[in-house]
Amino acid sequence: MMGPMSTREPTIEIDARRFWSTVMRSGQIGPGKAGGLRRLALTDADKEMRDLFVTWCTEAGCTITVDRVGNIFARRPGRDDHLPPVLMGSHLDTQVAGGKYDGIVGVLAGLEVLRTLDARRVATKRPLELVCWTNEEGARFTPPMVASGAFASVFDVDWVLALRDDDGKVFGSELERIGYDGKTAVGGRGIDAYFELHIEQGPILDREAVPVGIVVGGYATRGMHVDVHGETAHAGPTPMDRRRNALVGAAMLAVAVNEVGWNYHATEGKATVARMVAWPNKAGILSEYAQLTCDVRHAEREVADRMWAEVKAAMPECARRANVEMRIAGEWQFGSERFDPGCIRLIREAAEQLKVPHRDILSQAGHDAYYISRIAPTAMIFTPCRDGISHNEAEHAELDYTVPGVNVLLHSVLSRANR
């Protein structure tokens, strides 16, 4: 390999056609019903995409390792291979009715960086690693971002491996079934820095026609599963005052959560119930059990904490009115982190060097970068998506508005890896 190219050299750029053809190829694996993707974690479609990703990375000169929760690491050696690596990454799994770009663009942007360096025979002082995090979406195994969370010691590895989907299938068993039950330890190793490129999943960059968002941090997010316990009974003869319908209790709490969101709407607060299940969930019978998943989000951590307290305060009254029992089955929080100033500076310098219009921005969605920021200097780059639509098969991104961000990623990583 040649020596490291100066990161001030403006001529090195990615191969835009190669990058976009890779994104389009990914968009053929796990097709949805309306033009998007349904590629849930650890399904056959996920395996097909993972296998192709590994092939691409190997062809770019990388060595592959897989850890116990299925995270894939593609390593490109550095001139001093004993130094901690600079990481890039995101995820390849999607929502049930997801788009072709969420997470995927970030992983394949990292791949294009590796391909570009390989084609140009550019060596870096530090090794580079591209990571595909498992089950970022949490669409099949909840909560989201469990594998990056395990890597950052937020979640216990054995707890992650024991998670079950709605059909009772076990995370660890599904990893084994698709051949990605790796043997490498999860986390516990040195990282110089982590960079993640991602579509914004909001309307700001698209509305302002700005191709690069420099993510300085994220909305504080608080989430939980709530179990509701009642009693089965006949829907006909059972008097209203004797009913213990778990589904009604869950529905009351769902309305209360939504009201908290509206109460903070003026300051861009959000409260959501995104999932609800009930058993037996049949006509003519009251539900004995229900579970809902909810969260609150706000740019200010103190306000998010206040919103969360209001949600929890609503639980006893909802339980009393429905004559049921409620308990919190699990909680999580993320997003109140602020990203590393040094990594942010490198992104800003790269954007200015390449004359790419950019602006600072906060992330309002959850990302693997949040958990990695707890153990390593981290920053994110946002690129636009049309009308801010995401977690929807209509999600769309344009080549011309995505490539500038990938070039900024390339130069940011080069700068960091050559320190």
What kind of feature is each model-predicted range?
Residues 19-32, 89-90, 358-408, 413-416:
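Zn-dependent metallopeptidase/amidohydrolase metal-coordination segment
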Residues 26, 88, 97-137, 222-228, ...:
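Alpha-helical metal-binding/catalytic segments enriched in His/Glu/Asp
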Residues 92-94, 128-139, 201, 232, ...:
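Acidic, glycine-rich active-site loops and adjacent beta-strand->loop/helix elements
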Residues 135-136, 140-302:
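Midchain, well-structured core segments that form catalytic/ion-binding scaffolds
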Residues 216, 234, 238-263, 308-313, ...:
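His/Asp/Glu-rich mid-to-C-terminal helical/loop segments that flank catalytic regions of hydrolases
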